[in-house]
Amino acid sequence: MSEPARLISPEKRGEDLDITLRPQSLDEFTGQAEARANLKVFIEAAKNRGEALDHVLFVGPPGLGKTTLAQIMAKELGVNFRSTSGPVIAKAGDLAALLTNLEERDVLFIDEIHRLNPAVEEILYPAMEDFQLDLIIGEGPAARSVKIDLSKFTLVAATTRLGLLTTPLRDRFGIPVRLSFYTVEELELIVRRGARLMNLPITEEGAREIARRARGTPRIAGRLLRRVRDFAEVARAEAVTREIADEALTRLLVDNVGFDQLDKRYLNMIAVNFGGGPVGIETIAAGLSEPRDAIEDIIEPYMIQQGFIQRTPRGRVLTAIAWKHLGMQPPKEMEAAQFRLFQEDN
């Protein structure tokens, strides 16, 4: 799969783990204003009562700050933070080891909880609801059930695919939080903060140019900033200007809306091979030689949010914005079909 090597992939990479660039409090955190305001209330209320915070579920595309927010929550609650991910917890014993080592009110963060083993998920239910572990010891006729009391903890989980969570698991989270893509203005603040922490001079226009191409995602903004810094330093520039940022990102094949070669292949394939759509996701995946999950989780969310494609019951359809971006004219019959659809919706 080619996707992890993409500069604009929102998935985690080693260079993204620089904790010095991460905000350390909710006040330092830029964006997600509604979510932050609500979390502040819930955290303060839990601290005042001396209780564990209700379990929290973060939902949203990768790279929007779910892990960072979980770490900040633990810090502001004044408790320990433990982190893992759904695929890592292979069996019930793995989960039991994590839970039994938690202290009172600690935060356990599980990323990609939608990929949790179903057998492990069953063990998690009583742990979340009653703070007890129900384990089966032994096999066959000698097997017996053992209950283990747990410290009252807070589970903070993250998922990019809410629809893949079972209803019993989803219903056990008292605080669901949906995160959305960031505005260019918010990303500009994030880029300027990152540049300041890197001791990198940057102009307002330079920061905005990077922000415009970051696909609404702070993780991508930080990665683009690092690469632009490389170009600026080699060019011995006094500061990152709009021109330097534009030249660097253009050379890195990131266009003015944050699309790379794979995004353009996606749009071109629908436009050229299928007349703008509709075309099914399995056909797109086969044509791009990319897994369906990568297309639905990585490529499409930002395109849909920006209005480049529509998901319809019959498949994906390019919008007028996409045709304009490609520099192509949509087929006449497609324009007529979209006009009829617009009239029906209104």
Curated annotation (Swiss-Prot):
Keyword S-adenosyl-L-methionine: no
Residues the record lists as binding ATP: 21-22, 63, 66-68, 129-131, 172, 182, 219
EC numbers on record: 3.6.4.-
Molecular function GO terms recorded: ATP binding; ATP hydrolysis activity; four-way junction DNA binding; four-way junction helicase activity
Keywords tagged on the record: ATP-binding, Cytoplasm, DNA damage, DNA recombination, DNA repair, DNA-binding, Hydrolase, Nucleotide-binding
Annotated spans, Large ATPase domain (RuvB-L): 1-182
Any GO BP: DNA repair
Residue positions binding Mg(2+): 67
Region: Small ATPAse domain (RuvB-S), residue numbers: 183-253
GO cellular component, one term: Holliday junction resolvase complex
Lyase among keywords: no
Signal peptide: none
Domain of life: Bacteria
Primary localization class, coarse: cytoplasm
Catalytic reaction list: ATP + H2O = ADP + phosphate + H(+)
Pfam families, per database record: AAA_lid_4, RuvB_C, RuvB_N
Compartments where located: Cytoplasm
UniProt subunit comment: Homohexamer. Forms an RuvA(8)-RuvB(12)-Holliday junction (HJ) complex. HJ DNA is sandwiched between 2 RuvA tetramers; dsDNA enters through RuvA and exits via RuvB. An RuvB hexamer assembles on each DNA strand where it exits the tetramer. Each RuvB hexamer is contacted by two RuvA subunits (via domain III) on 2 adjacent RuvB subunits; this complex drives branch migration. In the full resolvosome a probable DNA-RuvA(4)-RuvB(12)-RuvC(2) complex forms which resolves the HJ.
Record note on domains: Has 3 domains, the large (RuvB-L) and small ATPase (RuvB-S) domains and the C-terminal head (RuvB-H) domain. The head domain binds DNA, while the ATPase domains jointly bind ATP, ADP or are empty depending on the state of the subunit in the translocation cycle. During a single DNA translocation step the structure of each domain remains the same, but their relative positions change.
Function description: The RuvA-RuvB-RuvC complex processes Holliday junction (HJ) DNA during genetic recombination and DNA repair, while the RuvA-RuvB complex plays an important role in the rescue of blocked DNA replication forks via replication fork reversal (RFR). RuvA specifically binds to HJ cruciform DNA, conferring on it an open structure. The RuvB hexamer acts as an ATP-dependent pump, pulling dsDNA into and through the RuvAB complex. RuvB forms 2 homohexamers on either side of HJ DNA bound by 1 or 2 RuvA tetramers; 4 subunits per hexamer contact DNA at a time.
Similarity comment text for this entry: Belongs to the RuvB family.
Protein name per the record: Holliday junction branch migration complex subunit RuvB
Organism, as annotated: Rhizobium leguminosarum bv. trifolii (strain WSM2304)
The gene coding this protein: ruvB
